[in-house]
Every structure is written in C-alpha cells, then in structure tokens.
C-alpha cells in the first residue's frame, strides 16, 4: 500500500490561479493544485495554516462574504492547523471558518474554552 500525504501551507488567500494584478492565468493557487491531485482512500491532504489573510481575494471575502467561502474552498483538507495570520481578522471570523471546515483541526498550542469547538493536539488515522 502506498500512502500519499500532500501538505499545503501559507496559502495567504491565494486560491485562484492568478496574482490578481495582471489577471493572467498562472500555474499557481490552491485550486490549480487541486486540479492536479488524484485523491483516493490512501491520500491525506493537510494544511499548515496562514490561509485566511494575505491576498486581495482574502480581504474581499473578509469584508463582503464571510469565512465560510474559504472553508468551502478547503473542503478536501483532511487535517489542518492554524497559523498566526489566521488570527488577524479576529475571533468571530476565525471561529466561523473553523465551524465550517470539514477537516479535523489539529493544534497543540491553542484552546477555546468558550465555543466548544473540538481542537485536538494530534490525530491517528487508520487505513
């Protein structure tokens, strides 16, 4: 059995294959990567955080749409953690993102005693 672990990190809101300046399509962005991944039962997709802030798209989503849009874009992630920039837009925005994520949140150095959101320090996956 071969297991594939695909890890992303520091997306900083760059989901679409563009730099948002010249509007030309580029071989970048999270969605461009997903188009090239063949995910199966032996593929684990993880993300290391710093997802919510950093691009003009991320700022637009924060101002006008809400973090559930970004959670929808990240729906294929099995396990994720939070980076320091994920806290930039405040507790309620981050909480909404976490509540809408399908993957499991892993953080050994974060607790939330008010919301009841499950935050695990690690995970064991049996295959």
Task: Please describe what each predicted stretch is.
Residues 1-127:
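Acidic, metal/ion-coordinating pockets
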């Amino acid at each position: 059995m071969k297991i594939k672990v695909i890890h992303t990190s520091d997306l900083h809101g760059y989901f679409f294959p563009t730099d948002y300046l010249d509007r030309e399509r580029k071989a970048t962005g999270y969605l461009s990567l997903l188009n090239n991944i063949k995910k199966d039962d032996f593929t684990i997709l993880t993300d290391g955080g710093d997802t919510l802030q950093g691009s003009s798209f991320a700022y637009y989503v924060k101002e006008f749409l809400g973090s559930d849009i970004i959670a929808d874009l990240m729906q294929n992630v099995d396990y994720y953690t939070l980076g320091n920039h994920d806290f930039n837009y405040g507790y309620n925005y981050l909480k909404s993102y976490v509540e809408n994520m399908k993957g499991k949140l892993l953080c050994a150095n974060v607790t939330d005693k008010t919301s009841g959101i499950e935050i695990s320090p690690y995970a064991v996956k049996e295959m």
